[in-house]
Amino acid sequence: ETHMALAMFEAGGLGIIHRYNTMKEQCLLVRDIAQILEDTSSTNINNIAAAIGTSSDFLQRAQGLVECGVKILCIDVAHGHHVLVEKSLKTLRDFFGERVTIIAGNVATPEAYRDLADWGADGVRIGIGGGSICSTRIQTGHGMPTLQSILDCRDSADAAIIADGGIRTSGDIVKALAAGSDMV
């Protein structure tokens, strides 16, 4: 994971440490990345990111990650427009204020995008079921093309739009950005 995050930084992207580690493992990865970025005088030192869920320990995990050097928290769930995401976003925003950037998602409708922004998300991952490995659309019967979701959401709120899923070619990246996504 360290190598992937560093490669993402080097390519101008954002490497997010996934949430399927223990908090201790996540913190060790974050510290490793921070040390490497510090040693190389990288400007990405302020872009260290890690994912969390919405389970009962989400705030404890978020606090630990921020203490380890995380500047960006990503609430990573398959469908982000539900009460646990609302509770998590509001709690994180109240606890951290503006000193932590919060990304949440995934959603596919203007209403959901607006709600996540209103609940405190700085960035919202747009797209459900478009990824090559994603089974959400099949399992839930819910999903829509990422490009259409971006077009529908782009004028609904001020949070950054992050196109997530359904991006397979460089042309898909260009289309997502042209449609209103702030990042892919």
Feature-to-residue mapping (PLM):
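Alpha/beta enzyme core
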Residues: 2-164, 168-183
